[in-house]
Amino acid sequence: WFDINDMDEFRVFTINNRDFPDPKRMNKYLHDNGFHSVYMIDPGVKVDDNYFVYKTGKEQNAFVCDIYRNEFHGKVWPGACAFPDFTRPETRTWWSGLYKDFMANGIDGIWNDMNEPSVFDGPGGTMPENNIHLGGGNLPIGSHLMYHNAYGRLMVEASYNGMMAANPGKRPFLLSRSNIIGGQRYAAMWTGDNEATYEHMKLSIPMSITL
């Protein structure tokens, strides 16, 4: 399991070439020794015009807007981040396309984390309820309050389709921290980052029942 430290300065869809100079060779070594590799992909995209994910997303108007229709930025592991608007079919197609080159490194599975979405400096640890999702297809324009519970579900759909396109005929291994009913067709779930406390044990009961 490769967490955010395998990334280049926490940029999603990148690998830290200093510590992992040859990821294809490393993953082949793992395969030869009976292991599979699962890499993390979060929704937060570092705001950096020289970073290909942010640059291509910005060109396609792929990110969530604030109430004033400006691109919303919130802090996550890389610092200031933009967040894909997965209600837009064009955004889901763009996100799916990012998996092809990434999976070509010999990656076996993906875990989508922080996809409630988690925003460190946002109200309640997420983005403002009045942020705007533009929708498209059968999804109307709406506030984040309307789409919060669906955000992770729409993300894993895009991730699943990208993994299928990258490795046709191979069943994807995709794990998600956030999902809703129906999303299990795309990704399994886990119950988040739990601690060994009675409070978290109590919370784990309804969470496990609804997996």
Regions found by a protein language model. Give the residues of each.
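Catalytic-domain carbohydrate-binding cleft regions of carbohydrate-active enzymes
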Residues: W1-L211
